[in-house]
């Protein structure tokens, strides 16, 4: 009797295993389907404004003001881009071109100065032991607790006394004041994640402390430096409040201020605002795509320690 039932039990066991495997595969399919659907929904929400910005930059004004809204414009034109870069000699085009140059100079200079000062300060905080080290780091980071509008008046009075109003140097000084603490915070954590023994070995071979920093530590900290530089560049590139208050001429105006001035007294040029937004977003996007693999690793290593 037992021998006769064995094939039947074996078939039932095989069928049960197949059924369990089928249920597991269906659960995995449902799980990954949900993950992909959620990722698609989030990506759509994130990318939709930028897609609409691109459409608005090439759409005819009649399409932008049409009711109901036309998601696909009937007339496509790149005249706004050509007016800015090719043949445009209007005040709007001149202002935007000057603002583009100003933003590149101010953001780049602010990042270079902040990295130089912040890396040295972060290395000292991570490697040296001196009184007030932690207190100084906390005080520098506490500047982020104040809203920007709260320190506008002191900064404005300082700029007046130093004769730096409406100058690129003035904005560079202001931007360094909040990029440097960010650099100090990220890089101090990154330096602590690098083994001290590597620097000790370099110093045994004859390197000074500064030489060990330049030849050993900085090459290992390159991902953190790139991540910090990118975020510092974004802070300076997108800043609006200080640039609006401390500048008044095309000699020092940045892109956010120039885009805001596309709004006239009696009319709003939505197409030019969209064109300016697209052009302003290209440099940060390009930098982010090129160095994206360093950004996550750099920030995570700097935040863990």
Task: For each feature predicted by the language model, list its residue ranges.
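A structural signal for multi-pass alpha-helical bundles of membrane permease subunits
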Residues: 6, 32-305
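Short, Lys/Arg-rich, polar N-terminal cytosolic tail immediately upstream
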Residues: 1-26
């Amino acid at each position: 009797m037992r021998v006769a039932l064995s094939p039947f039990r074996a078939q039932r066991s095989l069928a049960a295993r197949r059924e369990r495997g089928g249920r597991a595969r269906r659960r995995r399919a449902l799980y990954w389907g949900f993950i992909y659907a959620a990722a698609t929904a989030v990506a759509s929400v994130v990318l939709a404004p930028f897609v609409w910005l691109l459409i608005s930059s090439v759409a005819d004004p009649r399409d932008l003001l049409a009711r109901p809204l036309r998601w696909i414009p009937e007339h496509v034109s790149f005249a706004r881009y050509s007016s800015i870069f090719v043949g445009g000699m209007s005040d709007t085009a001149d202002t935007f071109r000057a603002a583009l140059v100003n933003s590149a100079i101010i953001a780049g200079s602010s990042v270079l100065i902040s990295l130089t000062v912040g890396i040295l300060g972060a290395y000292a905080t991570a490697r040296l032991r001196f009184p007030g080290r932690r207190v100084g780091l906390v005080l520098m980071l506490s500047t982020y607790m104040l809203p920007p509008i709260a320190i506008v008046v002191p900064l404005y009075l300082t700029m007046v006394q130093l004769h730096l109003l409406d100058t690129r140097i003035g904005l560079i000084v202001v931007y360094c004041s909040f990029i440097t603490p960010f650099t100090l915070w990220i890089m101090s954590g990154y330096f602590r994640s690098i083994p001290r023994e590597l620097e000790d070995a370099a110093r045994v071979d004859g390197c000074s402390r500064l030489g060990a920093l330049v030849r050993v530590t900085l090459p290992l900290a390159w991902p953190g430096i790139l991540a910090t530089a990118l975020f510092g560049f974004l802070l300076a590139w997108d800043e609006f409040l200080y640039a609006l208050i401390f500048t008044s001429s095309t000699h020092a105006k940045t892109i956010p201020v120039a885009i805001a001035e596309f709004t006239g007294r009696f009319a709003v040029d939505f197409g030019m605002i969209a064109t300016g937004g697209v052009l302003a977003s290209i440099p940060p996007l390009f930098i982010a795509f090129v160095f994206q693999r360093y950004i996550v690793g750099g920030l995570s290593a700097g935040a863990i320690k």
